[in-house]
Swiss-Prot record:
Keyword field contains Transcription: no
Residue spans of biased composition, Basic and acidic residues class: 62-79
Entry superkingdom: Bacteria
Gene Ontology molecular functions: transmembrane transporter activity
Record-stated family: Belongs to the ABC-4 integral membrane protein family.
Gene Ontology cellular component list: plasma membrane
Organism the protein comes from: Bacillus subtilis (strain 168)
Protein name: Uncharacterized ABC transporter permease YclI
Length: 486
C-alpha cells in the first residue's frame, strides 16, 4: 500500500477534518487571490493614467537664486525681468520624452479701438484715476512689474489647447478657432465672448492694443477665435480691469513679446514641457542639465500633480492589498499548521505502527503532504471561481474609502490656505489640478499570472503547514510512540 492511497483513504474516512481544512484553505486562497488581483488592477490603472496624463516640467527664472545673489552682493531685493531665449527653450523641446510643449509670455495692455470690460471699483473711480497717473498695479505678469493701470491681460502662447483653462474645460472656443503653433509670428488673437459682445466684435475683425508701459507701442491683432470662460478670476478683479477674466486675450507668444518691446524679441517668460510618461520626468531633467542653458539663472520645476491626484487613492489600495497578501499568507500558514499538528498528534499510533513495520519516515511525511496538497488544489479551484467577485467588491469598497479619506484631507488642507493659494499664479505654469477626477473604480479581473502566484503561495503554505508539525513527531522512535499510546 503506497502513501498516496493512504492519503485518499484517510481523507475519506475523516471527512469532517478534511472539510475544515478545505474551508480554511479556501478562505486563505480567496483573500490572497483578491489581494493579488487588486494589485494587478491598480498597477494597470496607474500605468494607463500615467501614460495618459504624463507630467510637465517648467523652465523658468529661478527667483530664489536671483534674490540670494542680490542679498550676497548687498543690493536691495527687487524683481528683475529675466526672459528666456526661445533658442534655449527649443533645445529642451528637442529632447526625448517631450510629447508637447508650450511657451508662455504675459503682459498687460490698454484697449485701443475698443473698450475693455470695466470692473466695479475701476468704473467708480475712473474720473479720479484719469487725473492721476499714479495707478499702482503690477500688470506685467512674468514680464516684470508695471506701475500703471492696465485694461487687458495678454497671454502669449504656442497653443491655447495646452493652456490649463482650456485643457481643464474652464474655457472653450465658441466661434472661430484656437491659437496653434502655425500662428507663431502672426498678429492674431482669441478674445473673450463677453468682450466681443460688448464691442460688437466678431471673428475676422481687427483690434488694436497699446502697451501699458509705452503708449507708442501698439499691436494690431486680427480676431481668429472667441472663447467662453467659467472662471471667476482673481478676487482683485473687481479692483483691476486687467484681472477681469473677460479682459483676457490670447495671442501667439511672438505677438505678446512685440507688445513688450524690442528687448523681449525672441524671448518668453516660461516654457512648459509635457512628458509622454510621468516616470520620464527625471530622465528629461537630467538630459536638460547637460545642455548649455544657464541653470544658475533658470530652473526646472517638475510637476506630476495631476497624476498623483488621480492615482493617489488607488496606490493606497494597492499598498493595502499587498499587506493583506502578506498577512493572510502568514496567518494562513500558522492556522493550517495548527490544524495539521492536531491531526498528526491524533495519528501518533498510526505512525508508530507504520514505522514499526518498516515504513520510511519520508513516506509518512509524503502522505500528510499529499492530503494537504489535495485540499490546496481544490481550494485554489474554488478561489478562482469566487475570487473575482470578492476582489471586485473588496477593491472598489477600499477605493471608495480611500477617495473619501483623501477628499476630507484635501478639504482640510485647503481650509488652512486662505484664498486657495491665490489668483493667477496657480494656473500659470501647468500646475492646475482642480478639475482632475480621481480613479473611482477598479476593473478587477483574475489573470493567469495571479493564479500562478496563488498556486505558488498555496503550495508553499501547504508545505510549511505540513513539514513543521511533522518534524516534531517523526523524530520520535516507533517504540516510544507505541509505549506512550498504551
Amino acid at each position: 500500500m503506497n502513501f498516496i492511497k493512504r492519503a485518499f483513504w484517510n481523507m475519506k474516512a475523516k471527512k469532517g477534518k478534511t472539510l475544515l481544512q478545505l474551508f480554511v484553505f479556501t478562505v486563505i486562497c480567496v483573500f490572497v487571490l483578491s489581494g493579488l488581483a487588486i494589485q494587478s488592477a491598480a498597477q494597470k490603472s496607474s500605468e494607463l493614467a500615467r501614460q495618459e496624463l504624463g507630467g510637465s516640467v517648467t523652465l523658468q527664472v529661478d527667483r530664489q537664486k536671483q534674490m540670494e545673489k542680490q542679498q550676497d552682493s548687498g543690493e536691495k531685493r527687487s524683481f528683475e525681468s529675466t526672459p528666456i531665449k526661445v533658442s534655449d527653450a527649443n533645445k529642451l523641446a528637442a529632447l526625448d520624452h517631450v510629447k508637447s510643449y508650450n511657451y508662455t509670455t504675459s503682459a498687460s495692455a490698454n484697449a485701443g479701438n475698443f473698450d475693455a470690460i470695466e470692473s466695479s471699483s475701476s468704473s467708480d473711480s475712473s474720473s479720479s484715476s484719469s487725473s492721476s497717473n499714479a495707478k499702482n498695479s503690477q500688470g506685467g505678469g512674468q514680464g516684470g512689474p508695471q506701475m500703471v493701470q492696465a485694461d487687458l491681460s495678454i497671454e502669449g502662447v504656442i497653443s491655447t489647447a495646452l493652456v490649463d483653462d482650456f485643457s481643464d474645460g474652464d474655457s472653450k472656443i465658441t466661434d472661430g478657432r484656437a491659437i496653434t503653433k502655425s500662428d507663431v509670428g502672426k498678429k492674431v488673437t482669441v478674445i473673450n465672448e463677453t468682450l466681443a459682445e460688448e464691442n460688437d466684435l466678431s471673428v475676422g475683425d481687427s483690434i488694436t492694443i497699446e502697451s501699458a508701459t509705452d503708449e507708442d507701442t501698439t499691436v494690431k491683432l486680427k480676431i481668429v477665435g472667441i472663447y467662453k470662460t467659467t472662471s471667476s478670476g482673481d478676487d482683485q478683479a473687481q479692483n483691476f480691469s486687467f484681472l477681469n477674466p473677460y479682459n483676457k486675450l490670447y495671442t501667439p507668444y511672438t505677438a505678446t513679446a512685440a507688445l513688450k518691446g524690442d528687448d523681449y524679441k525672441n524671448t518668453i517668460d516660461s516654457a512648459v514641457y509635457y512628458m509622454d510618461d510621468a516616470k520620464n520626468m527625471d530622465t528629461f531633467v537630467k538630459a536638460a542639465k547637460k545642455t548649455s542653458i544657464d541653470f544658475d539663472t533658470y530652473t526646472l520645476n517638475t510637476n506630476d500633480q495631476l497624476y498623483q491626484q488621480m492615482v493617489g487613492p488607488i496606490e493606497n489600495v494597492a499598498s493595502f492589498s499587498k499587506n493583506v497578501v502578506y498577512l493572510v499568507s502568514v496567518a494562513g500558514a500558522v492556522i493550517l499548521g495548527l490544524i495539521v499538528m492536531m491531526s498528526i498528534r491524533e495519528r501518533k499510533y498510526e505512525m508508530g505502527v507504520l514505522m514499526a513495520i518498516g515504513e520510511k519516515r519520508w513516506k509518512l511525511i509524503g502522505q500528510f503532504l499529499t492530503e494537504i496538497l489535495i485540499v490546496a488544489v481544490i481550494a485554489i479551484g474554488l478561489a478562482s471561481v469566487t475570487g473575482n467577485l470578492v476582489a471586485n467588491q473588496l477593491g472598489n469598497q477600499l477605493l471608495s474609502q480611500q477617495i473619501s479619506s483623501s477628499t476630507d484631507s484635501t478639504q482640510t488642507a485647503s481650509g488652512q490656505m486662505p484664498g486657495g493659494g491665490g489668483g493667477m499664479g496657480g494656473k500659470m505654469f501647468g500646475h492646475s489640478s482642480s478639475n482632475v477626477d480621481v480613479i473611482d473604480s477598479l476593473n478587477v479581473a483574475v489573470s493567469m499570472n495571479d493564479m500562478l502566484i496563488l498556486g505558488g503561495i498555496g503550495i508553499l503554505i501547504a508545505i510549511i503547514a505540513t513539514l513543521l508539525p511533522s518534524i516534531s513527531v517523526l523524530r520520535l522512535h516507533p517504540k516510544t510512540i507505541l509505549t506512550k499510546q498504551e
